[in-house]
């Protein structure tokens, strides 16, 4: 069977930063991309086809130039987290008011697993993080959704 004829599945996660910290370690959230093995009767291969991130956020203040990057990283086979998607965000506020930004990005991964035994979950660890380039702080917030597209071949 070709991957195009295989079962399609999505895995969606939400990440919410009520305020962006000046400490980058506080701006990381871990999300797993999972295909459950429960109820499966035969071995399967899993293809992580793509990862898409969509987000919006806001900031407040007067004469503020805000810039940052949203990173989506995936755990590589050697155990290290490596970025696969980097999306810039930001804006400039002239008056003492609230300002909004939004963005999205998508990457085609095509990461295939070996055969996974029935009843065993397949997963890939991912990390969503924010990098502060300029003025991202407690006056900024961001909400993000990450959608992983999977193909399952039995």
UniProtKB/Swiss-Prot annotation:
Q: What does the UniProt entry say about where the protein is found? A: Host nucleus; Host cytoplasm
Q: Does the keyword Nucleotidyltransferase apply?
A: no
One cellular component term (GO) for this entry is: host cell cytoplasm
Q: Fetch the InterPro entries from UniProt.
A: Nanovirus_C8 (IPR008706)
List the transmembrane segments: none
Please provide the record's keywords in A-Z order.
Answer: Host cytoplasm, Host nucleus
Function field: Putative nuclear shuttle protein.
Q: What family does the entry list?
A: Belongs to the nanoviridae nuclear shuttle protein family.
What name does this protein carry?
Answer: Putative nuclear shuttle protein
Query: What species does this protein belong to?
Result: Banana bunchy top virus (isolate Autralia) (BBTV)
Which gene does this sequence derive from?
DNA-N
């Amino acid at each position: 069977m070709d991957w195009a004829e295989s079962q399609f599945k999505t895995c969606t996660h939400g990440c919410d930063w009520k305020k962006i910290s000046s400490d980058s370690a506080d701006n990381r959230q871990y999300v797993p991309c999972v295909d459950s093995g429960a109820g499966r009767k035969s071995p399967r291969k899993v293809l992580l086809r793509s990862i898409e991130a969509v987000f919006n956020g806001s900031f407040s203040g007067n004469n503020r130039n805000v810039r940052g990057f949203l990173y989506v990283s995936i755990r590589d086979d050697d155990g290290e987290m490596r970025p696969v998607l980097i999306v810039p965000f930001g804006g400039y506020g002239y008056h003492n008011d609230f300002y909004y930004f939004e963005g999205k990005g998508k990457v085609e991964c095509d990461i295939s697993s070996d055969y996974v035994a029935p009843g065993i979950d397949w997963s890939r660890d991912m990390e969503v993080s924010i990098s502060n380039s300029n003025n991202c702080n407690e006056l900024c917030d961001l909400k993000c959704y990450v959608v992983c597209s999977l193909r399952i071949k039995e």
